[in-house]
Amino acid sequence: MWSLLLLAALVGQGFALKNVFDMRIQCPHSVKFGETSVSGYTELPPLSLQEAEQLVPESSCNMDNHQSLSTINKLTKVIWRKKANQESANQNSFELMESEVSFKGLCMLKHRMVEESYRNRRSVICYDLACNSTFCKPTVYMIVPIHACNMMKSCLIGLGPYRVQVVYERTYCTTGILTEGKCFVPDKAVVSALKRGMYAIASIETICFFIHQKGNTYKIVTAITSAMGSKCNNTDTKVQGYYICIIGGNSAPVYAPAGEDFRAMEVFSGIITSPHGEDHDLPGEEIATYQISGQIEAKIPHTVSSKNLKLTAFAGIPSYSSTSILTASEDGRFIFSPGLFPNLNQSVCDNNALPLIWRGLIDLTGYYEAVHPCNVFCVLSGPGASCEAFSEGGIFNITSPMCLVSKQNRFRAAEQQISFVCQRVDMDIIVYCNGQKKTILTKTLVIGQCIYTITSLFSLLPGVAHSIAIELCVPGFHGWATAALLITFCFGWVLIPACTLAILLVLKFFANILHTSNQENRFKAILRKIKEEFEKTKGSMVCEICKYECETLKELKAHNLSCVQGECPYCFTHCEPTETAIQAHYKVCQATHRFREDLKKTVTPQNIGPGCYRTLNLFRYKSRCYILTMWTLLLIIESILWAASAAEIPLVPLWTDNAHGVGSVPMHTDLELDFSLPSSSRYTYKRHLTNPVNDQQSVSLHIEIESQGIGADVHHLGHWYDARLNLKTSFHCYGACTKYQYPWHTAKCHFEKDYEYENSWACNPPDCPGVGTGCTACGLYLDQLKPVGTAFKIISVRYSRKVCVQFGEEYLCKTIDMNDCFVTRHAKICIIGTVSKFSQGDTLLFLGPMEGGGIIFKHWCTSTCHFGDPGDVMGPKDKPFICPEFPGQFRKKCNFATTPVCEYDGNIISGYKKVLATIDSFQSFNTSNIHFTDERIEWRDPDGMLRDHINIVISKDIDFENLAENPCKVGLQAANIEGAWGSGVGFTLTCQVSLTECPTFLTSIRACDMAICYGAESVTLSRGQNTVKITGKGGHSGSSFKCCHGKECSLTGLQASAPHLDKVNGISELENEKVYDDGAPECGITCWFKKSGEWVMGIINGNWVVLIVLCVLLLFSLILLSILCPVRKHKKS
């Protein structure tokens, strides 16, 4: 074992790519009763015949291989060769050589070996060989107790130059066999096969090993003779033994033949009718050529005197097992026949054999494991969310458009769990699991992160910090309003004067700028008037020497005195008395504004008179009266804003925030509603219809329309199969085409085109001297059949909704279809039309459990199907297997001295593979609450892809006198509450509702606090006690949720938990799809104050320490105010 591990670690990458192969063993995630074993196999590339005879399997698995497989087994080797003398070549120009050969580890299982390996926790590892005269293709088989699935994930098997990596894969099946994406549990009872209508039928791959054992109960040839109705003698002296089989790679041993086990009967029938079983072709060997040399008889063993086995010699790629056991002797004479097809046809009595290993499909009755709904929850993890999905049975499919769904599975008894990571929580997480759409509202996760952060910052008082955090972390404006309210209450006495001072400083800054600007503008106006007046009376103000325009008379006189003397009139600096020199000096002179400033001091007052700036300076922002007034006013305004913003979070698709009560409609005219409703949505309409003449007279109206149900009458077409198409050329030099039987003749679907007596020198191999004597057989057949889905053809489809109306004390219900109406004395409810994607004649294909939805095919062949069409290979229930037609043309390709080769120009890709390649072009649909038989399928659409056009008319002709009083009495009591207020997930309130005075009453029960209602549930009450669960979203920490009916509520309410960091469960889409409309009034100012008061009382009654802490903080702010802003002392006069 260790040598193998070391070798696997040291081999190069090229060796690993070429010589390491996978064997995948599928394990259910629960160990069932009985000696259950799991099995697997893998095909290996060819090696020489001499190497094949030296093979010995090795294993690094922690379950040791059964010891009996290490013993040497002897077989009779039969091989053919051409005769040395070919001068007179004919159809008998070849001969056989028999000899004894020894193998170690060949699949020659002993009696009770599999059972002992189960009890001793040992594995059975062996191999089989498919050989021609020069090379062999090994196939490795492994049988291991099911406990290995829990003990290891992988191990390594060595066989010659090859390494096989055994990988244990957990399926989502509890104990069943995975087929068609569903978990099938076969039933061995014969009665289930007789009553097939009560059971499902599935095609399961089976592996069988022949075990030679003498005894009267093991006379297998007698059973074969009886099954085929042949009259063979001396069956008691022929081979004895039985086949031990593992069904679907996961079952307890099945022994064939066994009359009391239907599984054994099917296996035995398959071995007799198709003794070669599945071929051993590797990928790329679907197209191959055989050259048949002819039939010959051999002596088994070689020491006997007479020939007792007929074989067919061939040359080409080996496709079928070369091991068998002779039927003519009870001593167990095993055969190894490379390059020879042994005669396995049991319709003749002599010269035949039985296959040592058989692999093929059998049809079994049984049942499919139930698909359980998924539970999905998420918790915050770093910047994203860590989620987990689990289901009671198994998870057959889980996807998410916004998460990285891993393959990490955990199993606890029958429960499967899958963990995955979502990188973003800024949007809701959508997960599709077991055909259900789950929505995880991540807003609650963000709330939890906020609470966690605030609580961590103030960890000295965790209880108080948490109580404050749950108020601050409510999303939206309400959280900010809460923060503003708490800050104002605690620190308002410090923040109000501080903020006022900051505002005053800003205002004074702008006032000062405005004041200065006004003074400058007035001074400029004075200068302009002085200049205009001087120019009118005395002339120009421009200096004659420097040409500078002066602003005052005093400045002009200074220019006239200084400029002449070559001095600057401002700074008295000497400069040349020229215009250019003086103008250049003015640009650098610092005193040019001297005369302007002197005049400004004369005309502008120095002190600022009373005005805005002075008023701001005199404002008493430290006044205790001002602070108290502002503090009180801010608390009132913020409380109103807080209460108004504490709205519920709307239910999808519609729930409006409303107060207690029900809306009323005066019946002046007929009441008509016309709308479109998605197929997944329920609709509730509730109103009080009032007499337009007398408002005191009213009748309650309650209409409930359930979600759309889809019912289709179908024809069960059966199971659709994927398959591989093989094209084999078989050439023999002598004889008619009917002379030989080829192994593919026993395949379920095959077709052959023969070119008989057409060979010539231009179309012959060099060792075939005959001309016009032989046959070229072109054989098409399907192998590797695998069921992939179940198909149903729609005969008719019906869309319906259940409609219930409570009009006063009258209660009526009816299920209406498309273009149908429900008419009562006062109401008419019609489905005018339905927008749908289903139509008569469509085919529904389910590629897995029907709970996961399916694909719609508009064109599905049901007769004259060609290979490659949708529905090409079908296995109908209780009918023979349906094979496709092969419409392509054959061509025999010939070359001189070359074996002819068949060519086929038709399609070679199966219909299933074509559909997978273009699957996005087909319409798909999801299902929920699906119920099905072979004749009918009923389900609901969880995605709302279909829509109904609904029209409701309520007549205005109502007898208000007799219908105004409703005798039904409803009593309410809040029993339990789960969930959290103010979160995205919401809460669920359980109400005990009693009904008296009438037998049945359709109404709605709502979840409300003192002010508003957050959710409602339409329910049909029966006389006595009823339990009603209401889902709501919203509220605050002081909300006491009560059960309400109209304006009447239960006496006591229950408080929901605070939103926190716990896991957030996914919400099923169907549970959330309801439209509720009762016309209740919206929340007004009175309602807002009720909410504020309820919140304050909730804090006082809840965690009163929080109120103490807030008051301490208020006292601290008052002390801080007295220190920073002391009261001014007034002196006594």
UniProtKB/Swiss-Prot annotation:
Q: Which GO terms describe its molecular function?
A: zinc ion binding
Return the protein name.
Envelopment polyprotein
Coiled-coil stretches are none
What ranges are annotated Cytoplasmic (topological domains)?
A: 505-626, 1126-1133
Q: Where is the signal peptide?
A: 1-17
> Which BP terms from GO are recorded?
fusion of virus membrane with host endosome membrane; signal transduction; symbiont entry into host cell; symbiont-mediated suppression of host innate immune response; symbiont-mediated suppression of host TRAF-mediated signal transduction; virion attachment to host cell
According to the record, the residues making up region (Binding to the ribonucleoprotein) are: 514-531, 586-603, 590-601, 609-623, 1120-1133
Database matches in InterPro entries: Envelope_glycoprot_Hantavirus (IPR016402), Gc_C_bunya (IPR048791), Gn-B_hanta (IPR048790), Hanta_Gc_N (IPR002532), Hanta_Gn-H (IPR002534), ITAM_motif_hantavir-typ (IPR012316)
Gene Ontology CC: one annotated term: host cell endoplasmic reticulum membrane
Sorted keywords for this record are: Disulfide bond, Fusion of virus membrane with host endosomal membrane, Fusion of virus membrane with host membrane, Glycoprotein, Host endoplasmic reticulum, Host Golgi apparatus, Host membrane, Host mitochondrion, Host-virus interaction, Inhibition of host innate immune response by virus, Inhibition of host RLR pathway by virus, Inhibition of host TRAFs by virus, Membrane, Metal-binding, Phosphoprotein, Repeat, Signal, Transmembrane, Transmembrane helix, Viral attachment to host cell, Viral immunoevasion, Viral penetration into host cytoplasm, Virion, Virus entry into host cell, Zinc, Zinc-finger
What is the similarity comment for this entry? Belongs to the hantavirus envelope glycoprotein family.
Q: What is the lineage of its organism?
A: Viruses, Riboviria, Orthornavirae, Negarnaviricota, Polyploviricotina
Q: Which residues form the ITAM domain?
A: 609-632
Q: Which Cys-Cys disulfides exist here?
A: C27-C149, C61-C155, C107-C126, C131-C136, C173-C183, C208-C245, C232-C349, C374-C433, C378-C387, C403-C422, C450-C473, C733-C768, C737-C775, C749-C883, C763-C894, C778-C902, C804-C813, C821-C830, C861-C865, C968-C998, C991-C1043, C1008-C1013, C1044-C1049, C1083-C1087
